[in-house]
From Swiss-Prot:
Subcellular location: Nucleus membrane
UniProt membrane topology term: Multi-pass membrane protein
Similarity field: Belongs to the TMEM168 family.
Residues the record marks as carrying a glycan: N111, N533, N598
InterPro entries to which the protein is assigned, alphabetical: TMEM168
GO molecular function, one term: sodium channel regulator activity
Name of the protein: Transmembrane protein 168
Keywords tagged on the record: Glycoprotein, Membrane, Nucleus, Transmembrane, Transmembrane helix
Domain of life: Eukaryota
UniProt function note: Plays a key role in maintaining the cardiac electrical stability by modulating cell surface expression of SCN5A. May play a role i the modulation of anxiety behavior by regulating GABAergic neuronal system in the nucleus accumbens.
UniProt entry tagged with the keyword Amino-acid biosynthesis: no
Length: 697
C-alpha cells in the first residue's frame, strides 16, 4: 500500500515538474525573443549616438550637440515615465518619435567628408546589425506565435517614427524637405498596402524600392541609415502577408467600420491627391526637347486618365453609399448575430465589387501610362506623388478584389407550410380532430418561426412565408412560384441562390399534395425553373420537411443542365415509444435550422438512434457552380446606373477584360475532379457558400 502511494505521489510530482519545465521553457523562449528585440533597439540607439557624435566631431556644428543631448534627455524622461510612473503609452510614444527624428538627422546630415572614418564605418556596421536583428526578431516572433495580429492601418510605433523622420527632413531646403515628407507619406501608404495584403502590394514594394535610387528623391546622404529606417518599418507588414490570419473584413475593419463622414472625406482626400498628381504630371509640358512626343502623348493619355479617374472616384463614392446602407442594417440588428459580411453579401456588394475591381484596374493602368509619358526623373515631388498614388489605387483595387472573392452571393427565400397530418385514402387532406388542432397549430407556428429565423440569420431576402390550413391550389401555387423564381436584385441581375422551403403532405412518389386533388411534380417545378432562369447561372435549393422527400432527392441527381439541390428528411416510422417520441413534421426543420444558425450546437446527424435523419441530393453539375460573374450586359447596366454618358466608350474595354479566360485548362481539370467527388464521395456536410450547409445522416 505504501509503495503504491509512493509511486502515485512520485508519478504526480514528475508530471508536475515536467509541465513546469515546459512552461518555463515557453516563458524563457518568449523572454529570449523580447530580449532580442531590446538588443536590436539598443544597437540602433548606439548607432545613432555614434553617428551623431561623428558628425559633431567632424563638422563642429553645435546644433548637432544640442539635439543629441536633448535626444538623450528625452529618452531618459521616457525611461522614467516607463519604469517609475507606469506610463507605458506616453513613454513609448515619446521614444519612438525621437528615434525617428534622430535617425532622420543621421540620414540627412552630410557625411561626404568623413565617409572613410573608422567611427563612421562602425556606425554603418551597427546599422546593418540592427537591420539583421530586427528581421530576425520579427521572424522568430511570428514563427513562435507570439504576435497577436489586430486590425489596424498603421501602428502607433510606425506612425510616430514616420512623423519624427519627416520632422528631421525640415533641416533641408523647402523643396527637398517637401519631397522627403511626401516620400514618407508614400512609405506610410505602402505599409498600409502591405498590411491589407492588396493584390498589387508586392509590385508596389518593388517599384518603391527601385525608385529610391533616384537622387532627385533626395534620399539621404547616408543610404545605410535610410535602409535601416525603411527595412525596420517594412519588415512587420511584409512578413504579415504570410503570417497574418486575419480575414478580409478583419483586415479592412478600421476602414469598413469607420464613420460615414470620415469615409466620405477619404474619397475627397483621394480626389485631391489624384488632382495634384495630374497637375505635377502636366509640368512635363515645359520640356521642349521632346515636345513632339510629350504634347500629343499627354493630351491623349491625360484625357484617358481623367475619364478613368472620374470613374474611379464615382466608384468609391458608390461603394460608400452601399456601405452606408449596410451599416444601417448592421447597427439596427447588432443583437441578431448579423455580421457585416452577411449584410454586404445580402445587399449585392459582391456584384458591385467585381465590376468595380475592373474599373479601378483601368485607373491603375491609366496612372502607369501617364506616369511613363510625363516621367520627370529630376522632379522629386513628382516621383513622391507617383509613389503615393500607386498604393492608393492598389488598395482600392485590392479591397474590391478581395470583397468580390470572399463575399457570398445574394439569395432569396420562400416558405410554404401546409399543416396537415391526416389524409384520406386517396391522399387528400381531411379535417383534423379538435383535440389535435392546437398541437398542430403550435407545431406549424414553430416551423414558420424557425424558417424565418433561418432567413434572417443568413440575411436571405424573404419573398414570403405562406401558411395555409386548407391547402393551396395548383394555379395559386403556380403564380406564387412564378413570381418567386423571377425575382431580381436591386441592381438588376438575378439572385445567386433561390431557396424554396416546403412542409406539408406529399404522396409516396414525393409529389406535393395540393387542394382539389392536384399535385406538383419535381419535373414541373424544374420546367418552371428552366423557364425563369434561362441562361443565367443561378441555383435552386429545395428544403423539404415531409414524409416522402427521398424520391425527390434521388430524382434530382439525374438532372444535367441546372444547379439544383434537394435537402430532405427521413422520419423513422418504427420507433420504440418507451424510449423516444415518434417523429413528426417540424422536427427536422427545428434541428436543421439550429444546426445552421448556432455554431455551438450539439447536433450530430450521423449518431445512431436518431428518429429524424437528413438526406440530400444535388444535380450532376452542382460542383461546377460558381457565383455569378459580371457579364457584358451587367457591366453596361452598372455603367448606365452609376456613370456619366461620356465614359460609355470604356464599356467595350471592360467587356473585353471580362471575356479573358487564361486558365481554362486548369479550371476544366479541377471541374472534372469536383464532379467525380460529388458523384462518388458525396460529403456528409456540404457547404453551400451562403453560410448554411446541406447535411446527410
Amino acid at each position: 500500500m505504501c509503495k503504491s502511494l509512493r509511486y502515485c505521489f512520485s508519478h504526480c510530482l514528475y508530471l508536475a515538474m515536467t509541465r513546469l519545465e515546459e512552461v518555463n521553457r515557453e516563458v524563457n523562449m518568449h523572454s529570449s525573443v523580447r530580449y532580442l528585440g531590446y538588443l536590436a533597439r539598443i544597437n540602433l540607439l548606439v548607432a545613432i549616438c555614434l553617428g551623431l557624435y561623428v558628425r559633431w566631431e567632424k563638422t563642429a556644428n553645435s546644433l548637432i550637440l544640442v539635439i543629441f543631448i536633448l535626444g538623450l534627455f528625452v529618452l531618459g524622461i521616457a525611461s522614467i515615465l516607463y519604469y517609475y510612473f507606469s506610463m507605458e503609452a506616453a513613454s513609448l510614444s515619446l521614444s519612438n518619435l525621437w528615434f525617428g527624428f534622430l535617425l532622420g538627422l543621421l540620414c540627412f546630415l552630410d557625411n561626404s567628408s568623413f565617409k572613410n572614418d573608422v567611427k563612421e564605418e562602425s556606425t554603418k556596421y551597427l546599422l546593418l546589425t540592427s537591420i539583421v536583428l530586427r528581421i530576425l526578431c520579427s521572424l522568430v516572433e511570428r514563427i513562435s506565435g507570439y504576435v497577436r495580429h489586430r486590425p489596424t492601418l498603421l501602428t502607433t510605433v510606425e506612425f510616430l517614427e514616420l512623423v519624427g523622420f519627416a520632422i528631421a527632413s525640415t533641416t533641408m531646403l523647402v523643396e527637398k524637405s517637401l519631397s522627403v515628407i511626401l516620400l514618407v507619406v508614400a512609405l506610410a501608404m505602402l505599409i498600409i498596402d502591405l498590411r491589407m495584403k492588396s493584390f498589387l502590394a508586392i509590385p508596389n514594394l518593388v517599384i518603391f524600392t527601385v525608385l529610391l535610387f533616384f537622387s532627385s528623391l533626395e534620399t539621404p546622404k547616408n543610404p545605410i541609415a535610410f535602409a535601416c529606417f525603411f527595412i525596420c518599418l517594412i519588415t512587420d507588414p511584409f512578413l504579415d502577408i504570410y503570417f497574418s490570419g486575419l480575414s478580409v473584413t478583419e483586415r479592412w475593419k478600421p476602414f469598413l467600420y469607420r464613420g460615414r463622414i470620415c469615409r466620405r472625406l477619404s474619397v475627397v482626400f483621394a480626389g485631391m491627391i489624384e488632382l495634384t498628381f495630374f497637375i505635377l504630371s502636366a509640368f512635363k509640358l515645359r520640356d521642349t526637347h521632346l515636345w513632339y512626343f510629350v504634347i500629343p502623348g499627354f493630351s491623349i493619355f491625360g484625357i484617358f486618365w481623367m475619364i478613368c479617374h472620374i470613374i474611379f472616384l464615382l466608384t468609391l463614392w458608390g461603394f460608400h453609399t452601399k456601405l452606408n446602407d449596410c451599416h444601417k442594417v448592421y447597427f439596427t440588428h447588432r443583437t441578431d448575430y448579423s455580421s457585416l459580411d452577411r449584410i454586404m453579401a445580402s445587399k449585392g456588394m459582391r456584384h458591385f465589387c467585381l465590376i468595380s475591381e475592373q474599373l479601378v484596374f483601368f485607373s491603375l493602368l491609366a496612372t502607369a501610362i501617364l506616369g511613363a509619358v510625363s516621367w520627370q526623373p529630376t522632379n522629386g515631388i513628382f516621383l513622391s506623388m507617383f509613389l503615393i498614388v500607386l498604393p492608393l489605387e492598389s488598395m482600392a483595387h485590392g479591397l474590391f478584389h478581395e470583397l468580390g472573392n470572399c463575399l457570398g452571393g445574394t439569395s432569396v427565400g420562400y416558405a410554404i407550410v401546409i399543416p396537415t397530418n391526416f389524409c384520406s385514402p386517396d391522399g387528400q387532406p381531411t379535417l383534423l380532430p379538435p383535440e389535435h388542432v392546437q398541437e398542430l397549430n403550435l407545431r406549424s407556428t414553430g416551423m414558420l418561426n424557425a424558417i424565418q429565423r433561418f432567413f434572417a440569420y443568413h440575411m436571405i431576402e424573404t419573398y414570403g412565408c405562406d401558411y395555409s390550413t386548407s391547402g393551396l391550389s395548383f394555379d395559386t401555387l403556380h403564380s406564387k412560384l412564378k413570381a418567386f423564381l423571377e425575382l431580381r436584385t436591386v441592381d438588376g441581375p438575378r439572385h445567386d441562390t433561390y431557396i424554396l422551403y416546403y412542409s406539408g403532405h406529399t404522396h409516396g412518389t414525393g409529389e406535393w399534395a395540393l387542394a382539389g386533388g392536384d399535385t406538383l411534380r419535381l419535373d414541373t417545378l424544374i420546367e418552371w425553373w428552366r423557364e425563369k432562369n434561362g441562361s443565367f447561372c443561378s441555383r435552386l435549393i429545395i428544403v423539404l420537411d415531409s414524409e416522402n422527400s427521398t424520391p425527390w432527392v434521388k430524382e434530382v441527381r439525374k438532372i444535367n443542365d441546372q444547379y439544383i439541390a434537394v435537402q430532405g428528411a427521413e422520419l423513422i416510422k418504427t420507433v420504440d415509444i418507451e424510449e423516444a417520441d415518434p417523429p413528426q413534421l417540424g422536427d427536422f426543420t427545428k434541428d436543421w435550422v439550429e444546426y445552421n444558425c448556432n455554431s455551438s450546437n450539439n447536433i450530430c446527424w450521423t449518431e445512431k438512434g436518431r428518429t429524424v435523419k437528413a438526406v440530400y441530393g444535388v444535380s450532376k453539375r452542382w460542383s461546377d457552380y460558381t457565383l455569378h460573374l459580371p457579364t457584358g450586359s451587367d457591366v453596361a447596366k452598372h455603367w448606365m446606373l452609376h456613370f456619366p454618358r461620356i465614359t460609355y466608350p470604356l464599356v467595350h474595354l471592360a467587356n473585353w477584360l471580362c471575356g479573358l479566360n487564361l486558365f481554362w485548362i486548369c479550371k476544366t481539370c479541377f471541374r472534372c475532379l469536383k464532379r467525380l467527388k460529388m458523384s462518388w464521395f458525396l460529403p456528409t456536410v456540404l457547404d453551400t457558400g451562403q453560410g448554411f450547409k446541406l447535411v446527410k445522416s
